[in-house]
From Swiss-Prot:
The gene is gyrB. NCBIfam families: gyrB, PRK05644.1, PRK14939.1. InterPro entries: DNA_gyrase_B_C, GyrB, GyrB_hook, HATPase_C_sf, Ribosomal_Su5_D2-typ_SF, Ribsml_uS5_D2-typ_fold_subgr, Topo_IIA, Topo_IIA-like_dom_sf. Mg(2+) 1 binds at residues 435, 508. A type II topoisomerase that negatively supercoils closed circular double-stranded (ds) DNA in an ATP-dependent manner to modulate DNA topology and maintain chromosomes in an underwound state. Negative supercoiling favors strand separation, and DNA replication, transcription, recombination and repair, all of which involve strand separation. Also able to catalyze the interconversion of other topological isomers of dsDNA rings, including catenanes and knotted rings. Type II topoisomerases break and join 2 DNA strands simultaneously in an ATP-dependent manner. GO terms for cellular component: chromosome; cytoplasm. This is DNA gyrase subunit B. Coiled coil: none annotated.
């Protein structure tokens, strides 16, 4: 019997454990008060988190070690666990099953009974009833008492009482499947990445609990497992995986018997210049901190002060250090478990429980100071970093004072390169940051000078990820940008003086432009995060192509838009004839072309691993599977190769031939005496990419097994493969038009730039948002930091996803 089964005690968690505080109608009337924003996706995802938090609460109580979240094809979500199962007995006060009480009445649940749960999360403490109230339908399955129970709800209303559907079941747990209400939520499509981040967070915070996330919505099934035995120490290492830690992790794990408050903490200093502290209460993240964060900061400052006084190292300090100096480069995960936590709002973004502060401050001070005393060499390295931070802060202060004195003597302290706008209202003013004087000149001519300002940046932009604050202030480009914006950075940061409420990065669509954009994004993320949080930072989307047909001119954003245009311009004049009989035109032909486009995308992706032409010809002949090894398929394989050879006819190359082996097939030919060989392994045929291609090919198999002839404006083409059909359609679309590809903004004249990128009524802007702070932290550190290995691994992992590489 497992430890979890041994702990199982139904008598301690029964119907009488459920305390009731009634009322659900308010949830449907004002859902935002209970579940979060119903328009931006946060409330939608909180529906999942609420159910998952119930399962995690079971694990905190010691009864659950497996949680599974499944995104279903029909748009619903299933959350299951192997906990005790929701109580099913008739509730004494309500006269209905405890399960129905929990699902239909607000503020009902075991969390209100201290004997059932000592500590609990639960998104807003309102129970899964909120999820039920805001779901079009919900299905509840419970495994308890060796039985399986089932109950269904529509818009929070019970369809029928809880019923036993199976008996003699050796299983315990709860499963909730729900479909969000389209009347409540603006968008009901769940984002895999958002859910993945939260579940990974929970797995780190609850060491030993396995959490599975499965996405069944698409042909490509995604499955991710989160299981960490290292707890929050492993979490700190994960967050800081792209940085150099200057010492091993400091771990604190303690509980205050009197208050029942427990503390878990893992922290280390790294060689970066930014602090990163994540705070949790009962597994819920407090993005705005609170009493636990204040206590931690105070304790760390006290530790450093005390250690300096004790060791005499303070005599070597050139400058007094501040609390911020002690936290430069500090990465910490702080998790407290509190029996009855209090928060500043229902979204629980800030902890206000005053009793938490002394517990955390005393524990952190005692344990961390003890660690310093036991590890003098590591402590010395930490102190050296803090002193260096204090010196840099002092140098930055002097640099700011010098800048202010210079500004006070100038008639106008706006940079000379800035072509400012006439408007003084920041709400309607826009600043375009462009690379180089050439693009800057064109932008100045094409802009609306009433509301649009242009700031050209010339020369190399500093990578602030690798630079101290004082060095950053000395950078000409960064200094120019700060002055133009009208605000300072770091400790003096205030959006009140921001001169533009749209700050738009406008760079070329090549590698250099991408690099400059990344450097600017790094600066804003590190030193002006509020600009991003308020939604003031944007990225311009200049077009990649200009298309001219007769007197008409228009612009296309990217390769995909160009392809779509060329297909649509041809499709109305095209007819596909099948076996000299059936004809595909109009919508039917367009439907086929859309399938071919998707098929081509699958082939492009798989071409990184095997020859594209061979893959395609095998797929449309139903041979991209184990059938290819069967003798009965030899004739079909020969015909397929004949088609391939007719398409790739070249005087320098011989025809493709094939050799079958037990577990592989070799395709080979000779080019000027040299053998070119492609090996297809049997195991490759079972890979996800090939299975996906093979299945999709069956949807167009009937058409491409026939003799095809494409007619476009009386011109005829014999068609043998999907790629040939698509390429012919595209080439026909190019006739009579002129296509110009822009490599840089400087290639556009001022009218073109206005029409495509500057005109507020026509342009496309991407608003910069940070969905998950610690994920963004990891990405910036990986791509822009000093550590090479994580960057190399990142590039290796994503190299095959590159579609267009500008070299």
């Amino acid at each position: 019997m497992s430890e979890i089964e041994e702990k199982f005690n139904e008598s301690s968690y029964g119907a009488d454990s459920i305390k009731v505080l009634k009322g659900l109608e308010a949830v449907r009337k004002r859902p935002g008060m209970y579940i979060g924003d119903v328009g931006d996706g946060s409330g939608l995802h909180h529906m999942i988190y609420e159910v998952v938090d119930n399962a995690i609460d079971e694990s905190l109580a010691g009864y659950c070690d497996l949680v599974r979240v499944t995104l279903n094809k029909n748009g619903s979500v299933t959350v299951s666990d192997n906990g005790r199962g929701i109580p099913v007995e008739i509730h004494g006060e309500e006269g209905i099953s405890a399960a129905e009480v929990i699902m239909t009445q607000l503020h009902a649940g075991g969390k209100f009974d201290q004997n059932a749960y000592k500590v609990a999360g639960g998104l807003h403490g309102v129970g899964v009833s909120v999820v039920n109230a805001l779901s079009e339908w919900l299905e509840l399955r419970i495994w308890r008492n060796n039985k399986e129970y089932l109950m269904r709800f529509n818009n929070g209303i019970t369809e029928a009482p809880l019923a036993v559907v199976k008996e003699n079941i050796d299983k315990k747990g709860t499963e909730v499947t729900f479909f969000p209400s389209v009347e409540t939520f603006t968008n009901i499509e769940f984002d895999f990445g958002t859910i993945e981040h939260r579940l990974r967070e929970l797995a780190f915070l609850n060491s030993g609990v396995k959490i599975l996330l499965v996405d069944n919505r698409f042909e490509e099934v995604k499955e991710v497992e989160f299981y960490y035995t290292g707890g929050i120490e492993a979490y700190v290492k994960y967050i800081d995986r792209a940085k150099h830690a200057i010492h091993p992790c400091i771990v604190v794990n303690t509980e205050n018997a009197e208050s029942g408050i427990s503390l878990e903490l893992a922290m280390h200093w790294n060689d970066s210049y930014h602090e990163n502290i994540l705070c949790f209460t009962n597994n819920i993240r407090q993005r705005d901190g609170g009493t636990h964060l204040s206590a931690f900061k105070s304790a760390i400052t006290r530790v450093i002060t005390s250690y300096l006084d004790t060791t005499g190292l303070n005599k070597k300090a050139k400058n007094y250090f501040s609390g911020e100096d002690t936290r430069e480069g500090l990465c910490c995960v702080l998790s407290v478990k509190v029996p009855d936590p209090k928060f500043s709002s229902q979204t629980k973004d800030k902890l206000v429980s005053s009793e938490v502060r002394p517990v955390v401050e005393n524990a952190v001070y005692t344990k961390v100071l003890e660690w310093f005393e036991e590890h003098p060499a590591e402590a010395k390295a930490i102190i050296a970093k803090i002193m260096e931070a204090a010196n840099a802060r002092e140098a930055a202060r002097k640099a700011r004072e010098l800048t202010r004195r210079k500004s006070a003597l100038e008639v106008s302290n706006l940079p000379g390169k800035l072509a400012d706008c006439h408007a003084k209202d920041p709400a309607i003013s826009e600043l375009f940051i462009v690379e180089g004087d050439s693009a800057g000149g064109t932008a100045k001519q094409g802009r609306d000078s009433k509301i649009q300002a242009i700031l050209p940046l010339r020369g190399k932009i500093l990578n602030v990820e690798r630079a101290r604050f004082d060095k950053m202030l000395g950078s000409d480009q960064i200094g120019t940008l700060i002055t133009a914006l009208g605000i300072s950075v770091e400790r003096e940061f205030s959006l009140e003086k921001l001169r533009y409420h749209k700050v738009i990065i406008m760079t070329d669509a090549d590698v250099d432009g991408s690099h400059i954009r990344t450097l600017l994004l790094t600066f804003f993320y590190r030193h002006m995060p509020e600009l991003i949080n308020k939604g003031y930072l944007y990225i311009a989307q200049p077009p990649l192509y200009k298309v001219k047909k007769g007197a008409a001119e228009f612009y296309l954003k990217n390769e995909q838009a160009l392809q779509d245009y060329l297909i649509k311009s041809t499709i109305n004049d095209a007819t596909l004839i099948l076996d000299d009989k059936e004809r595909l035109v109009g919508d039917n032909l367009e439907e086929l072309i859309n399938k071919v486009v998707k098929f081509n995308g699958l082939l492009d992706h798989a071409s990184k691993k095997f020859n594209r032409s061979i893959t395609e010809i095998l797929a449309i002949n139903d041979l991209l599977n184990n059938k290819i090894f069967e003798p009965e398929s030899d004739l079909r394989l020969k015909k397929a190769l004949d088609v391939l050879n007719s398409l790739e006819d070249s005087p320098d190359k011989t025809n493709w031939e094939v050799l079958k082996h037990e577990n592989k097939i070799e395709f080979f030919r000779f080019s000027r005496g040299l053998k070119e060989s492609k090996i297809l392994l049997k195991e490759q045929l079972e890979s996800f990419e090939f299975v996906q291609i093979s299945k999709f090919a069956l949807t167009i198999f009937d058409i491409f097994s026939k003799q095809l002839k494409l007619i476009v404006k009386s011109q005829e083409f014999d068609i043998l493969t999907p790629s040939q059909l698509l390429n012919t359609i595209i080439e026909c679309g190019k006739r009579g038009i002129n296509i110009q590809r822009f490599k840089g903004l400087g290639e556009m004249n001022s009218d073109q730039l206005w029409e495509t990128t500057l005109d507020p009524t026509k342009r496309t802007l991407l608003q910069v948002r940070v969905a998950e702070i610690d994920e963004a932290e990891g990405i910036f550190s990986t791509l822009m930091g000093d550590v090479v290995e994580p960057r190399r691994l990142f590039i290796q992992a994503n190299a095959l996803n590159v579609v267009n590489l500008d070299v």
